[in-house]
A protein has these predicted regions:
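A residue-level marker of the well-folded mature domains of exported/periplasmic proteins
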Residues: 1-221
């Protein structure tokens, strides 16, 4: 997907998991990065998978929903190779493709619940995917519900700002940092960031305003 192995998100978490498994089981592993970085196409992703298979990979692990088309093509062509699709959906008829998805709404619920129980009552949420990414939407829905549940228990009122506007590309931006900084200046105490590297924009705004951030995917402190 987009990003790199130091993105404090899916790529880093997936690669760390591959390394742990491989080292614990005396397996070899190698990272194949699609050409053109964040502008990679389906063909670029397929070429990276093909290179892995050509070099003898028995299992290919791909992270992120943008891998879907390339994975389907590769799994159809290389039937003797196993493919693992992190944050994806299964494809009918492809028995060599295993898809792993998550219940992001549960994670979001815990984040919202914990934030309010910690004493925060003015919350923010920034999601990736421009509002069309199911996983990021589930994080947001759970976050609101968790905050509401904790607020009811504590008998307090909670304010919530939320946006998916500047996270469509999952990349940091000056616009998102400005938006988050404005929230903080107007009283928002903590923002839950769900969308890959948009986390960098939120943390920059938080640092400038001595405020708090909730991360996701992997430890982002």
């Amino acid at each position: 997907d987009v990003g790199d192995l130091k993105d404090k998100s899916f790529n880093q978490g997936t690669y760390d998991g591959v390394k742990l498994y491989a080292n614990a089981n005396s397996k070899s592993y190698k990272y194949y990065k699609p050409a053109n970085g964040d502008k990679a196409t389906d063909d670029d992703r397929y070429d990276a998978m093909k290179a892995a298979v050509d070099n003898g990979a028995e299992v290919v692990v791909a992270a992120g929903f943008l891998q879907a088309a390339a994975l389907q093509k590769a799994a159809t062509e290389f039937t003797d190779t196993k493919f693992v699709f992190i944050d994806g959906s299964p494809v009918d008829g492809l028995t060599n493709l295993a898809a792993i998805s998550f219940r992001e709404e549960q994670c979001g619920y815990l984040a919202g619940y914990a934030a309010v129980m910690e004493g925060y009552t003015k919350l923010g949420f920034c999601g990736g995917g421009g509002g069309t990414n199911d996983a990021c939407c589930r994080y947001g829905y759970g976050y609101v519900q968790g905050a509401e549940a904790a607020a009811a228990e504590k008998n307090v009122n909670v304010e919530m700002n939320y946006t998916w506007k500047y996270g469509e590309s999952f990349q940091p931006s000056a616009e998102l940092q400005t938006l988050a900084s404005g929230w903080y200046k107007n009283g928002t105490e903590v923002i839950f960031s769900c969308g890959g590297s948009i986390f960098d924009s939120i943390t920059a705004a938080a640092s400038a305003n001595d405020a708090a951030v909730i991360g996701f995917d992997v430890g982002q402190s």
